[in-house]
A protein has these predicted regions:
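Register position in tetratricopeptide repeats
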Residues: 46-47, 80, 110-117
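Conserved structural position within tetratricopeptide repeats
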Residues: 59-62, 95-96
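Helix-start (N-cap) detector for alpha-helical repeat units in TPR-like alpha-solenoids
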Residues: 34-35, 68-69, 102-103
Length: 125
């Protein structure tokens, strides 16, 4: 009888693991979905549709909160729209996720230089 208990426990564990694996999307699927949102955001930003781009990049970081490039793009869009506090936070999150990413670091340093120098710049709601 003692051999039945461990087998049933193992079976329950396997069933639980399989259920979780099929219930949630894989990391690769999430990253691909986030990349699609980022690409769409880039496309609409190039056409001047910054609010739509922000929506897409916000979706990207909801889908994959570890996607530093999406935070960088989001920061640029917030900056463009005058949402400077949000831009700063997005740049900082991008740097937290990718501290060695020179593009993110360069964008953030330029953002700080411009906004710290023009401290009188008003933020849009």
């Amino acid at each position: 009888m003692s051999t039945t208990q461990p087998m049933s426990v193992r079976l329950a564990t396997v069933v639980a693991v399989v259920t979780v694996a099929f219930a949630s999307p894989s990391f690769a699927d999430a990253r691909n979905d986030a990349k699609a949102q980022v690409e769409f955001g880039i496309n609409v930003a190039q056409r001047g549709l910054w609010r739509e781009a922000i929506y897409r990049w916000e979706r990207a970081v909801e889908i994959d909160p570890t996607y530093a490039a999406a935070y960088n793009d989001l920061a640029i869009a917030y900056e463009h729209e005058g949402q400077l506090d949000k831009a700063r936070k997005a740049y900082e999150k991008a740097l937290e996720l990718a501290p060695n990413n020179q593009q993110v670091r360069q964008n953030y340093e330029l953002f700080k230089e411009i906004n710290d120098r023009t401290g009188s710049a008003k933020e849009k709601p």
